[in-house]
Structure formats: C-alpha cells, structure tokens
Amino acid sequence: MENYSSLLIGGKQFSSRLMVGTGKYKSTQDMVASLSNSETEIITVAVRRIKNDQTGENLLEKINWEKYWMLPNTAGCVNSDEAVRIAILGRELAKLSGQEENNFVKLEVIPDKKYLLPDPIETLKAAEILIKKGFAVLPYINADPILAKRLEEIGCATVMPLGSPIGSGQGLLNLSNIRIIIENSKVPVIIDAGIGVPSEASQAMEIGADGVLINSAIAQAANPPLMAQAINYSVKAGRQAFLAGRIKKQDFAVASSPEKNISI
C-alpha cells in the first residue's frame, strides 16, 4: 500500500504532507517550536519580508535549512511582472540558505487587498514565464477546475486551490470544485488558505488532497506549537482515511450485527 506520507513535488520527495508558513507568529520561539511539532519539511517564506524587514534576515538565521526545504512565495505581488521579479529573488535566497538546487516558488498574485483573492489571469501569465525560467511553480489559485487544469498543462509542479480566503479560518467552502480539481489533476493538489482547525485539515486529506499548507491556524492559535502538533496528526489521519476508503453514504440504516443464524 502507498505510504501515507510520501509526496513528490518537482522531482523531490517529501515525507510530510503538511506545509507550514512562517508569518504571523508572536515570537521566533513559537515559530521554531511549531515547525518542529508539525514535522513539516516544506516551509513558506515571504521574499518581500526577508528583503525589506530586518526580522526577515533573522528568520533566515533562526531556521535550520538543512532540515527544511524553503518555499519562497511572492506574497504582496499584484501583477505578473512583480511576481516574476520576486520569484527570482526568492531563488537567490534559497541558494544563500545552502539550497543550491532549489527552484521552487509559491506563486501568489493578489491585487485584491480586502479578500486577498488571487488574480487568475496574471497568475497564469507569471506561471508561464517562470516555468520557462526553470522554476517549479506552485500556484495559489481560486478553486477553479479549468484554471487548475490549464496550469497543470503548462507545467506547474502542483496546483494550490484555496479552501477559503487567506487567514479567514472559514474552512473548505467550495468542496464541490475542490473535488473536481482533485479528480482531474495529474499533479499534486495542495489545499492552501482558510483552514482553521485540525478537523478541516483532515477533511481536505480525506477527500483526496495530496497535502495542505497552513499558516494562520497555527501561528494565531492560543498555543501555536500545540496546534501545529494537532494539525500534524490530523493530516496523517486524513491521509490514512483516504487510503483506507470510507463506507458509502446511504439514506437508510444498515445493521452491523448479523441478522441470520443468531443463537439465543
């Protein structure tokens, strides 16, 4: 049987299906402890934060880059030109951290400041450019099955449909479209944004997602390290449940005890 924790992205294998963000933590200590408890191997880093913020430089120093694979993201970019420029800077940051072969980028193009919804047209445009430049592109998108398939066809390493708006904690609001994306996709589907509690992370895995990316649910919890551990367990449980196969839903009851040959 397939190992529940085996995940292949861009030719690189990972033993965890949980990706974790590095923003919004109250302290560096909380972040480091949460990363450890999550057992993640892929962590997202906002390139603009590292480039412009002194605490960003501290972030590079505080994380053991021999243990974690950096996933630079283009958060804050509002068009494809900005996203391409920041992605290139992100690749250089990965090299500075010792990951010479790291060409991953989490592509975010978000002009909408209120709901932080991704721009599908600019995302597709940026993805095409970055793929030609040798990037393994992990695009953050709305739960749009047509866009997801188009991004797969041009060579994206994954597709990352949102569960609900970033940081909203509303869970998986568009399950029908997410299911279609999972059913049609030949690349890993990572649910990104909106997950608020472990049960929602488990639900994403139970319906067949290949992984989840979580930041706010951990970083803004009352006890981030404990929440990271809980979500870690839920992702593993959800994956195992998917592989095990759930019973069919029915409109009537089915007795679990035998109805024949019962001795009294």
Curated annotation (Swiss-Prot):
Q: Which pathway does the record list?
A: Cofactor biosynthesis; thiamine diphosphate biosynthesis
What does the entry list as the binding residues for 1-deoxy-D-xylulose 5-phosphate? G167, A193, G194, N215, S216
Give the positions the UniProt entry annotates as the active site.
K106 (schiff-base intermediate with dxp)
Please state where this protein is localized. Answer: Cytoplasm
One Pfam family hit: ThiG
Swiss-Prot/TrEMBL keywords: Cytoplasm, Schiff base, Thiamine biosynthesis, Transferase
**What reaction(s) does this enzyme catalyze?**
[ThiS sulfur-carrier protein]-C-terminal-Gly-aminoethanethioate + 2-iminoacetate + 1-deoxy-D-xylulose 5-phosphate = [ThiS sulfur-carrier protein]-C-terminal Gly-Gly + 2-[(2R,5Z)-2-carboxy-4-methylthiazol-5(2H)-ylidene]ethyl phosphate + 2 H2O + H(+)
Molecular-function annotations in GO: thiazole synthase activity
Q: By its UniProt entry, which InterPro entries does this protein fall under? A: Aldolase_TIM (IPR013785), Thiazole_synthase_ThiG (IPR033983), ThiG (IPR008867)
Query: Which residue ranges traverse the bilayer?
Result: none
Coiled-coil annotation reads: none
Q: What is its EC number?
A: 2.8.1.10
Major location, coarse class? cytoplasm
GO annotations of cellular component type: cytoplasm
Which biological processes are named by the entry's GO terms? Answer: thiamine diphosphate biosynthetic process
Q: Which family does it belong to?
A: Belongs to the ThiG family.
Q: What does this protein do?
A: Catalyzes the rearrangement of 1-deoxy-D-xylulose 5-phosphate (DXP) to produce the thiazole phosphate moiety of thiamine. Sulfur is provided by the thiocarboxylate moiety of the carrier protein ThiS. In vitro, sulfur can be provided by H(2)S.
Summary of subunit composition and partner proteins: Homotetramer. Forms heterodimers with either ThiH or ThiS.
Xref: PANTHER family: THIAZOLE SYNTHASE (PTHR34266:SF2)
Q: This protein is called what? A: Thiazole synthase
Q: Which organism is it from?
A: Prochlorococcus marinus (strain AS9601)
